[in-house]
Amino acid sequence: MDIVIVTYNSEKWIKRCLDSLLKAKALSSDLKLFFVDNHSSDQTVELLTAYEKKDDFSRFEIIQQEQNQGFGNANNLGASFGKDEIVCFLNVDTEVFEDTFKRLEEIIAESSKEIGAWEFRQLPYEHPKIYDPVTGITSWMSGAAFAVRREIFDKLQGFDKNIFMYAEDVDFSWRLRASDYKIKYCPTVKIMHYSYESIGAVKPAQYVNSLINNLLLRYRFGSFSDVMRGYFQFAIVFFLTSGPLSGSEKTIASGFCGTFFTYLFF
């Protein structure tokens, strides 16, 4: 199984992430790791290079970018280095359990060909998810932890290169389902994801970029009324910006204009 992990100033998470993958390897021996670094300025690359047990993995690649080209682009690059039938994408601020990949492999083996991707369960704060309690089928998956059939990932040309960060997973999920494949949520395939310090926490960068890219997706997949609602949401956020989003007005305005002119004739 190919595992792609994107890093950017991620020195805080490297050892914990790698140590957990090493433990999981005991039950799923053929793990190939592809780290794509988006031009970190800290010790991320040095820590990856110096990891003393990297030879215990079937493959351990570090791909360094000369500039940060975004989360989706970096994942696409990492996936291009592998060849396995299943590609797994993990955020660097995650830890897998010893049986994570073993359970994933069992579920994949039991899945029909119409299942194109499998989303992991995130702990301690579960990713908001609506899914069929019997089949596990869901409408979209989080890019923080999921696996996909390589042939499908390649067919869809991976993540959209125009989406720098946030909502690239929603876009990919939509295109996957539009190609007549399904996404299965797997509650028994668990990871720890340290994205938030507390439940309900707001990350300004995530909120702002999600807002901008939400509008992009409304242009791409929605109706005229969907787009108008998106602009209305933009206006509300822009004029009522306060609290953790204070200081983001210029970014929001830039995203508004950029999305309008880029996708006006999409």
Task: Indicate residue ranges for each PLM-predicted region.
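Short, well-formed alpha-helical segments that are part of the catalytic scaffolds
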Residues: 10-24
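A conserved acidic beta->alpha catalytic loop
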Residues: 20, 37-46, 67, 94-97
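Short beta-strand/loop segment that forms part of the nucleotide-sugar
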Residues: 30-39, 63-65
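Glycine-rich, basic loop-to-helix element that forms the pyrophosphate-binding segment
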Residues: 64-82
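Short aromatic/hydrophobic "clamp" motif used to bind/position activated sugar donors
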Residues: 87
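Conserved donor NDP-sugar-binding/catalytic core segment of glycosyltransferases
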Residues: 95-132
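A short, conserved alpha-helix in the catalytic core of glycosyltransferases
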Residues: 104, 146-148, 152-157, 162-190, ...
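Active-site-adjacent helix/loop segment of glycosyltransferases
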Residues: 183-265
